[in-house]
């Protein structure tokens, strides 16, 4: 709200581009907006992730929300209900913006050009936290449940 006002924006879109969160399984608290709001008021961090709080706040402010990580976040009946109620779009499960994207694009090209690949080595030269986050068992579980690792 403050950003929108300070920058004289007519509209904003909230885009989540943080690292993969700790795995949060779909639970009763995600089945309806009332249950989600109750869990949020009770600060139930077992079922409410930080990204869910950001998504909820964005929707409440009529700002579309795009989930760029493989987190549960907006992929719940409660968020769908809130989005529909406010007529605010939500989308996304994973940008596939790093190594996965490169491999998804390059591998078919190599095959089409009949280029054999004996191995694949990649380095994260930018040093983001994804590998460190994936070393955490609960985060790795979240990523694996939402993608093709």
Annotate each language-model stretch with its function.
Residues 91-93, 97-149:
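Conserved anion/nucleotide-ligand pocket segment
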Residues 1-69, 73-86, 99-106:
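Metallocofactor- and cofactor-centric catalytic cores in central/energy metabolism, strongly enriched
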